[in-house]
Amino acid sequence: MLEKAMMLIFMLALTGCSPEYISEAAANETVVSEAVSSNTDTQKIVFESSYDVQETGGFVTEGTETYRDFIVDSVLHSEELGDIHYCVKIPDSYDGSTPYSLYITLPGYEGLYFQGAGINIRSEEFAFEAQKYKENMIIVAPQLDDWGELSADKTIALTEFFLRNYNIDREQVYINGYSGGGETLSLVLDKRPELYTRALMCSSQWDGDYEAVTEAKIPVYFVIGESDEYYGSEPFKEAYEAIYNRYKAEGISEEEIQKLVVLDIKPASYFEDRGVTSQHGGGGLFSRDETVMGWLFGTEYSEQAEN
């Protein structure tokens, strides 16, 4: 019995969350998802059969269901990393003749694969709100197992797979991570920052180093509640300062630094005005923040751009 108890404590430590926090955060994130979702109806279509596609860089089994135009639970089978589960939306207009943008969104705890296939896009709105900023864009929503090194490697492998097998504009490859997904994102940017054009870190902390991302000069936007219940805002402040100081030491101008790293601390009123009591769970609201999402995609919000 003691051995089992110790194992449970160990597993919780790996996730970085206490049982009480996990329960509370999941509840709050569900509330936020309901608050920001403009489409509460579940669209579920079962195709007649699934099929496998052999592509360069891995074997893909395409998902057999859809949710709000996303194919749910496709799998990239990697010999080195194992199965990489993801949901994907490829616009009907894509025929390979024109380069498209690529957007990857990494979920929080509630969106990990063990929670259920497709739960990431059912509980977060980033993948759907992004469509209002870029019309010709492939959107990939990985379902990872945690927010450690293996998940970072899987994210990189999935990114490289789409870059190899689809006609992607290499100047328009965007990525965001919310909560635990932000921790994964920081490790991704520590390993292969040059794959991405811009990165958005939401309600999280930076687990990676800073050398690679500053050498590659990949713009990063940090956004979090001032009193985030899980992380607090200090880790983002520290990460921002570390990146800022590196650029300053290189002699980069203040104007240019402001384009490369942004710190956006939201006050309590930001969440209260939107009917959300939890600042951490309320991080889901950032998906509908036109300043935040507009920065990521370098464009203005447009209702007409939504597919």
Report residues per predicted region.
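Gly/Ser-rich "nucleophile elbow"/oxyanion-hole loop immediately N-terminal to the catalytic nucleophile
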Residues: 93-98, 147-179
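Sec-dependent N-terminal signal peptides of Gram-positive bacterial secreted proteins and lipoproteins
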Residues: 2-20
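C-terminal catalytic histidine-bearing segment of alpha/beta-hydrolase fold enzymes
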Residues: 223, 227-229, 248-307
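Active-site machinery of serine-nucleophile hydrolases
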Residues: 100-102, 106-156
